Structures are given as C-alpha cells and as structure tokens.
Regions:
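Non-catalytic alpha-helical scaffolds and adjoining flexible linkers that form interface surfaces
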Residues: 1-24, 29-287
Length: 287
C-alpha cells in the first residue's frame, strides 16, 4: 500500500536547523508519526507567513508533502498552542524545555511507540509555558515518566535486584544523602543505619533503587536515599495529578538531588550525554 503524498498531523517543534539561505529543517515530534524531519521553505525571510509558528516548543497543526527520502516539506502551518514566547522569557523554563525536547527526540527516534511520549512532552511544555510549577521539578517529573514510558523506569516501589517492596522503614539514619545539583549526583552511600540505595549505572542489569539487603552486593558507587527523598522520587513518577502536592512542597535539596540522579541515570541508559543538561541551573530556594 503506497503512502499518501500529503497528510496532516499535530506537532511539537523540538529544534530547527538552517538550510540554505532562507529555509529551515524542522525536527518535530508528531502525534501520529513520531519524530519527523521536514523542510520549511523561505521561513527565514521577513515576509514568511508561518515562520513564527515553527519555532522550538510551538504546538502546531501541520500539512506535509511527502519527500523521496525521510525529509518532507511543510506546506501549511497553524498554531495550536504558542508556548515559545513564555518559555523563552524564563531562563529556567527555557533550559528545562531544551532538555525535555532533546530527551523526547532521543526516546522516540528509533521506535514506533510514541503516543505516550508525545502526550508527556506536550504536558511538560504547557506546564513550563504557564508557569504552573518550578521548571526543574517539571523536568524531573518528565524524566521519570518519559523514561518509564520508554521502558526504562528511573524509580519504583520495588528493589530492582530482588524485587521485594521498599518501605520508608528501609531509609533510616544517615544515608549519605548529599545534595546533587542538575546532572551532578554524589557517588557515596556511607553513613550508619539501614538505607535504600540509588544506583545510577546499568551494570549487571540493575539500576536505580536497591533495598538494604541488596545494596551491599553491588560493587558500584551508590547514593543513599532517605524516606523523604524516596517519597519525592515516587511522586515524580506518578501519573496522578495530585502528586504535585508532594512535589511542590519538597525541600530544594531533596528536589535537586533527585534531578541529578535522574539525569545521570538517563544518560547512562541512553548511552550518550544530554547536551542541553549542561546549561541547567540549580533550583534556587524561595526567600
């Protein structure tokens, strides 16, 4: 069955590349077709009718003409949601949106299962544009839920080695719960008492949370999690909107630590760095 020469789809613009003197290649996550590359002709001219609708983070309804390769042509563009301006006006929102866009592309470019990632990406960009929550916490929740949708859960209620349930009683005492800024997680799990450990590598098929019984068996750097940190991490992975009640009130050191662990684990699982993560700013406590 031949594919149609023209079609329409809703798209989230992830990034753009210059092409020639007046054109751009638009890299987008589409609702039905996943990652799509298409040429927008003459959009860099001042007289372009829809250049502004094809900026990063825009949510746009597009019409395409199929190309001979995987590079198609955009023929029409209509704005669905204009997220670019409010995101660009807030540096933290912009850097978090850039990492979200990079991660969305990485998670969907080699798979046909993109519906969940599309929905999560749209929700995260909308939340950033509307200023609904701290940008770094929107990114943290996006990391947890998008990686889970891609088959790589970053946190769970069971030990990833033995499968036994984790409880807050497992996170007692000093668990080496240092503060990790964006992409900069501590690699110690010293201290006394029982602790749940977080393992950022994918060594031997195990990563993320380990129970107190399994943690000593893993000969890799670990980071201890206190009960409050585990509770926050589990909230970020929840699909329940009420989880924001827990996420929004968490102390900054807790939120920053979990974001750092998530970023490091995600990059280990993807087996390449997220270039935009280096620009992320640490969350600043409210005065």
């Amino acid at each position: 069955v031949s594919e149609p020469r023209t079609w329409r789809d809703a798209a989230l613009i992830l990034r753009t590349q210059k092409l020639g003197e007046t054109d751009r290649i638009i890299i987008m996550l589409t609702r039905d077709g996943g990652i799509t590359h298409a040429v927008a002709k003459a959009v860099r001219k001042p007289t372009s009718k829809f250049g502004g609708r094809l900026e990063p983070f825009m949510h746009t309804d597009l019409s395409f003409s199929r190309g001979r390769t995987n590079l198609h042509t955009i023929t029409q563009a209509a704005t669905l949601h204009a997220y670019t301006a409010p995101i660009m006006a807030n540096y933290d929102a912009y850097t978090c949106a850039s990492t979200i866009a990079e991660l969305a592309e990485a998670l969907t470019k080699d798979t046909d299962s993109t519906a969940d990632i599309y929905t999560l990406t749209h929700g995260a960009l909308a939340a950033l544009a509307h200023g609904q929550h701290v940008p770094q916490r929107i990114l943290t929740r996006y990391l947890a839920r998008s990686m889970n949708a891609a088959g790589w859960p970053l946190i769970g209620e069971n030990c990833t080695r033995c499968g036994n349930p984790l409880t807050s009683a497992d996170s007692q005492g000093d668990a080496g719960a240092g503060n990790a800024g964006a992409g900069n997680a501590p690699n110690t799990a010293g201290g006394s008492g029982r602790y749940i450990a977080f393992h950022t590598a994918h060594t031997y098929g195990h990563h993320t949370v380990l129970c107190p019984q399994c943690a000593p068996a893993v000969d890799m750097p670990l980071t201890g999690l206190r009960a409050e940190e585990l509770g926050y991490a589990l909230a970020t992975a929840s699909a329940d909107p009420r989880a924001w009640a827990t996420i929004d009130v968490a102390p900054v050191p807790v939120a920053s630590k979990i974001l750092g662990l998530y970023l490091k684990t995600a990059q280990n699982l993807l087996e390449h760095p997220l270039k935009t993560a280096s620009a992320l700013e640490a969350e600043i406590p409210a005065s």
